[in-house]
Regions:
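Short, compositionally biased "basic patch" segments
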Residues: 1-8
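Active-site core of metal-dependent hydrolases
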Residues: 10-125
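Active-site proximal loops enriched in glycine and acidic residues that flank catalytic Cys/His/Asp
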Residues: 47, 71, 100, 282, ...
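Short linear, low-complexity motifs centered on an aromatic residue
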Residues: 76-92, 109-112, 117, 215, ...
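Composition- and surface-driven signal marking solvent-exposed, interaction-prone regions
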Residues: 219, 294, 316-317, 343-347, ...
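C-terminal amphipathic alpha-helical interaction region
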Residues: 507-703
Length: 703
């Protein structure tokens, strides 16, 4: 890659964006496409043919030889099938490059090989991908050459959603319709659309590729299943925001260049809290585009890391004892006029529309806390949530001092008469500039926090698509808006009705507001007293997806059908069971083939040393004590290994579903922890040269 470049010159150069379409498409075709994007109008095949031709010509100019419908099935990662632009050879033996409107609009991958949760039988293979024209096509360049990637939705032959994008787009329509209803009540007749804006911050680890390949657990599961803590971890806080090392800086430069060319607004990069941990954050985009971009970010991080002799770990908890990784899903609502509905203004107590929006969101989060928690449920996330490094598993809302004061006024007196003045920041140094204080501090222990003009949902796992959480957020807030509008549209005295409703929602849902330390034991007790759910694991979270309340909610806004929700719950149970099964089998393999043989070999050497020392006429007490300690731990390891084998076999023999997932959680996972304990103790006392894999110190500090 080039050493120096101008970001403005390269940004979006590989994106078939609005400017490119306006330049290349005939005026009428461009106008029809914009109408389809903005108003949801249908596109006729003749117009699609013109768009496809120009898209193909543009992509070929970029070096593309293939195109793919780029979609997001329920595997958690993107999927793609590549077709070249060549047509059947002519009589001369030459080929033409072609791409039709039909090929642009619709693809037909095999749906039977993707998770469907019973929606599709193995013999029912037909599935469709449909062009999402609101997310621009782009050319991706990698070792395979250049490929035209067309973002698409994925559905079954009978129309059920088999992906993340379809319900996300449905939820965006729901929040748009209900937001427009709400702002119309306040006299805004100009806005035609309200869009959820999303900015997902991405955390990740980087390790040396050679060391990665010496760890079966990292290869098969993405996290270390064994590993003792090194003498130093993250306790000095010296890695967070520290100077970025040259190898990492070179990697970040190449990541940024690739992302900028594909139109991803990579904005912020820094070292995170744990050693070898880093973060990348983009500028906000429309929810569906932001979801697509986050998938591109994860793919690009992994690809560029390999090119730099490293591996990017996106698992939520790749290393025990140091922080794991997540995504902060920043969410707001913006009109097509650029108005942010979550902007409180200078005097939020006077901003009635904002207060209604705010209290509706509190109502939504309080009433659907379990569903919001479920949207972040993942086997890896079970290691993070509630572990004093990430938000607790209890959903609460942090508002900050100013907004909490406004809410307290509403709850206690029935009206808000003032907003706290944030004032200036006093540094005590005359040469430093005077700084205005923000309206709220940051609370990193809160799962759902207001940060000035947006909410930040901090529970999402680092590997997960942010689609799931945004589907839930959009839908539950749309429902709260809908209920509020149902009341206010019938009111004879709108001003009184809206004030009464704001007070009602603030009072009824004030229990969800918590500005304190979410890591404390006191909060767990207080949350229980308030009646807030504390859902600690993925298997305990999944049932919220298929309650009658949830089904009614999603069916009301045509986001999910009952069958789609039931299928997703089934898939999640299966995914949990499969993930833990792979981890358990990997531990069994590593313990049986690497760790126990290495320890036996080492004890043999140690026993020889004991005998040699004794023969030399010296008391071998130290060596003998060490040999005894290792032998005891080796016995515990073998005993724990046998237990893990037994419960893993029992779990694998069970019928797939909730019962099997719970058995993996209740029996297999604890058995894995029991096997890890003696192995990690052994690593602390066995000669490093005898240990069969790189240590935490090697992985975290040698990259």
């Amino acid at each position: 890659m080039s050493e120096l470049f101008n970001v403005a010159d390269i940004f979006g150069e590989n994106v078939f964006d609005d400017a490119t379409m306006q330049e290349r498409l005939p005026k009428k075709v461009y106008k029809d496409l914009k109408k389809m994007i903005e108003e949801g109008k249908e596109l006729d095949l003749a117009t699609a043919d013109v768009i496809a031709h120009e898209m193909k010509e543009w992509a070929i100019e970029k070096g593309a030889t293939h195109y793919t419908h780029w979609f997001q099935p329920l595997t958690g990662v993107t999927a793609e099938k590549h077709d070249s632009f060549i047509s059947a050879p002519m009589e001369t033996g030459k080929v033409l490059m072609s791409f039709s409107g039909k090929e642009l609009i619709k693809g037909e991958p095999d749906a039977s090989s993707f998770p469907s949760g019973g929606l599709r039988a193995t013999f029912e293979a037909r599935g469709y991908t449909a062009w999402d024209c609101t997310s621009p096509a782009f050319v991706r360049k990698d070792a395979a050459g250049a490929t035209l990637c067309i973002p698409t939705a994925f559905c079954s032959y009978t129309g059920e959603a088999l992906d993340q994008k379809t319900p996300l787009l449905r939820s965006m329509e729901a929040i748009n319709e209900q937001s427009l209803r709400l702002i119309r009540l306040f006299g805004n007749t100009r806005a035609k659309k309200v869009t959820p804006s999303v900015g997902p911050e991405q955390e990740y680890f980087l390790v040396d590729a050679k060391k990665f390949l010496e760890r079966k657990d990292l290869i098969y599961t993405g996290r270390t299943l064994f590993g003792a803590m090194p003498p130093k971890g993250q306790e000095l806080d010296d890695h967070y925001f520290g100077t970025i090392r040259q190898r990492i800086a070179s990697f970040m430069k190449d990541v940024n260049e690739e992302l900028w060319k594909m139109g991803v607004t990579s904005k912020t990069q820094h070292n995170e809290v744990a050693p070898a941990q880093h973060e990348l954050a983009p500028i906000y985009a429309k929810a569906n585009v932001a979801v697509d971009h986050n998938q591109l970010v994860m793919q690009t991080l992994k690809r560029i890391a390999s090119e730099h002799g490293m591996k990017c770990l996106l698992h939520e908890k790749p290393f025990a004892g140091v922080n794991g990784s997540g995504k902060h899903n920043n969410w707001s609502l913006t009109t097509d006029e650029g108005k942010n509905l979550l902007d409180p203004g200078e005097t939020p107590h006077e901003n009635i529309q904002f207060l209604l929006v705010l209290t509706c969101i509190l109502k939504a989060v309080d009433e659907h806390a379990a569903l919001l928690r479920e949207s972040a449920a993942d086997p890896g996330n079970d290691h993070r949530l509630g572990a004093n490094e990430a938000p607790p598993a209890i959903i609460s809302v942090f508002l900050g001092e100013q907004l909490e004061d406004v809410l307290e006024q509403l709850v206690t007196t029935g009206e808000a008469t003032h907003s706290l003045n944030t004032g200036k920041l006093e540094t005590g140094v005359r040469t430093l500039p005077e700084l205005a204080k923000d309206t709220s501090d940051r609370n990193r222990t809160s799962p759902f926090t207001f940060t000035g003009n947006k909410f930040e949902f901090r529970m999402v796992g680092s590997r997960d698509s942010v689609a799931g959480s945004n589907i839930v957020l959009n839908t539950i807030v749309a429902d709260a808006f809908s209920q509020a509008c149902d009341v206010l549209e019938k009111a004879d005295d709108f001003e009184k009705a809206v004030h009464d409703l704001i007070k009602q929602y603030a009072t009824e849902h004030y229990r969800i507001v918590f500005n304190g330390n979410g890591y404390s034991d006191e909060w767990v007790k207080e949350a229980e007293r308030r009646g807030l759910p504390n859902i600690r694991s993925m298997v305990d979270a999944i049932p919220a997806l298929v309650t009658e309340e949830t089904i009614s909610l999603f069916e009301k806004f045509h986001v999910f059908t009952r069958a789609e929700l039931e299928s997703r719950a089934e898939i999640k149970y299966e995914n949990y069971a499969k993930a833990i099964n792979i981890e358990a089998r990997t531990m069994i393999d590593m313990a049986s083939k690497q760790i126990i043989p290495a320890i036996i070999k080492y004890t043999r050497s140690l026993a020889d040393t004991v005998n040699s020392v004794r023969e030399a006429g010296v008391d071998p007490q130290v060596q003998a004590d060490l040999l005894k300690e290792i032998t005891v731990l080796l016995g515990q390891t073998k005993e724990a290994l046998d237990v893990l084998k037994k419960v893993t076999e029992e779990a694998a023999a069970m019928e797939e579903g909730e019962s099997q997932a719970r058995y993996y959680h209740d029996s297999v996972f604890p058995a894995m922890e029991e096997l890890r304990r003696p192995v990690d103790e052994l690593e602390m006392i066995v000669d490093k040269e005898a240990w069969p894999m790189p240590s935490y110190g090697d992985l975290l500090f040698e990259v």
